[in-house]
Amino acid sequence: MCGTHVDIAAPLVWRCPRATDSDPHHALQLVQGTTPLRATDDANPFVAFQPYLAWDSFGAANGMTEAARTSMIRQLDIDIAGVAGTGFHVTPFDRADSLSEALGFTEDGGVWVKDETDNVAGSHKARHLVTILLHLLTTESLGLAPWTDEADRPALAIASCGNAAFAAATLAAAVKWPLRVFVPPHADPVVIAGLRQLDADIVECPRRDSEPAGDPCIHRFREAVATGAIPFTVQGTENMWCLDGGRTIGWEMARHLEENVVGPPLDRLFVQVGAGTLAASTINGFRMSGVTPRLHAVQTDSCAPLDRAYAKVQGVGGPKAAAAHWSECMWPWEHVGNSAADGILDDETYDWIPVVRAMTEGNGGPIVVTEAQVLEANDLGRATTGINASHTGTAGLAGLLAARDSIDNDERVAVIFSGVSRAALR
């Protein structure tokens, strides 16, 4: 966003080269082509959309054949399935008839639900992380890594106590790569137990009196990266390769609508936002289809830094000027409250700029929901669809509930049930 360009052939570049500890507000963005989106019928989205993925372009730019690149995806998928019980597959995206009826939509309109609960590690998070892993494995296979033996691999690192951590541990275990997970003292015991079963190194991160505002887990994570760990994270500001695989969600949704749904295109897309990576990746995926719905980013009133930033941006010249006014628009939420949708309580929306830009350019906007709406959305979503989604997973639906009175009955809207409920494991 500062104008710095990084060649797609460059290995092991995670952040903008101009980002420093004193000037961290830089973010690399993937440059998408304008070629019409055409996928194969392969069940694995990373094969079906392979030519559009940045990691694939990285391999090609360094002389790796198409067959070798495809083989790498397939072998990695086998390894992942050996740990997770499933590999990557195109996930369901269909009109939820009972939910649509409950919300008063006509037959021409309605709610389409993208169900990520049966994906690798139970959420969308592995989509983002697998393109980081493919970049690493490609770098190794081409002899471009500074290490020559698997035993000398630097540790992967992530700051998370939820689905992202579980996905990271699953993928790391599949390729036997060491992983350090930075978690808060109040981390969910179910998640911690799962991480230990996957041999992750868990680092508890209490707040230190002397440290600046922001998430202590992020501070410890960044310290680890500064000493050689690889950022294996779902924040594009820390590792831009996570934005690559996340686009497959938008590509799948756009392709399904084009090939299987008769009538007008999707009007709106409601996406729950913590770090912002899901929303940024999904809407960028839609852009390549040529049809982009209005984006509504959903946060809870317990923690809504994106909503605040969206309002601030309008006073500094709009999204195009946002990067130059980063500190004026986005800073850590001062008092993070509690919510059943605890997976979107990031005190900063790290990938906020592409989300704000998409909402502004597409005439969408942020929505802040109450805890009552978070709970209602989960009850309604589970009851009408039968999908075992968590409160975080259905938080986008809470945004739809909040905005329902302003939406015409014949509009077509979509939500993403992004993660499975692990409540039964407690």
For the regions a language model picked out, list residue spans one by one.
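Catalytic phosphate/nucleotide-handling subdomain of diverse soluble enzymes
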Residues: 398-426
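Positively charged, low-complexity intrinsically disordered leader regions
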Residues: 56-145
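Active-site-proximal loop->helix
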Residues: 150-158, 164-222, 307-313, 425-426
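N-terminal juxtadomain amphipathic helix
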Residues: 1-78
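Active-site/ligand-binding loops adjacent to catalytic centers
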Residues: 199, 207-234, 288-388
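Short glycine/serine/threonine-rich phosphate/pyrophosphate-binding segments
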Residues: 126-132, 157-175, 188-192, 243, ...
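A short, small-residue-rich loop immediately preceding and capping a beta-strand
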Residues: 142-184, 265-278, 295, 413-417
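Active-site/ligand-binding-proximal alpha/beta "capping" segment
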Residues: 219-289, 375-381
